[in-house]
Amino acid sequence: QASFHDDELKIIIYKDHLITYYRGVRTVDLKQVAHLYHHIFTMHRGFASNRNSTLIAVRSNNKKYQMPIRNIGKTTDVQLQSTFDYLYNHFPHIRLGM
C-alpha cells in the first residue's frame, strides 16, 4: 500500500521510495535525496511544441536522476504541490524546488 499516490501525474511514494511510472518506471531512495525539483523541457518542431515534465532528484553524492512525470499543462505545478507538501512533512531533509 502506497503512502502517497498521484494518479494524474503518475507519482507514487512507497515507504522511503519515490516512484514515477510515466514513460517507464523510475525509482529513487528518498533517504539519499538531498534536493528535488520540477523541470519543464520544451521542444519545438515546426509549428508544434512539446513540453515534457521531469522531477530531478539530486542525491547526496550530487548525481542527478531524471524521473519523467505526466505534463497536464499549466496546472502541473499546482497538482505537484500536494506531492511536495507530503515530502516536506515526511522527508524534511530534502530541499524542494529550485
Regions found by a protein language model. Give the residues of each.
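Helix N-cap / beta->alpha transition motif
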Residues: 14, 29, 97-98
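Anionic N-terminal interaction surfaces
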Residues: 1-15
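Glycine-centered tight beta-turn/hairpin loop motif at sheet-sheet or coil-to-beta transitions
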Residues: 6-8, 23-25, 60-64
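Acidic, Ser/Thr- and proline-rich intrinsically disordered linker/docking segments
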Residues: 36-98
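Phosphoinositide-dependent membrane-docking surfaces
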Residues: 18, 27-43
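Short loop/turn motifs at secondary-structure junctions and domain boundaries
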Residues: 19-20, 48
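Short, isolated positions in well-ordered beta-strands
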Residues: 18-19, 65
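Residue-level detector of beta-strand structural context in well-folded domains
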Residues: 9, 16, 26, 55-56
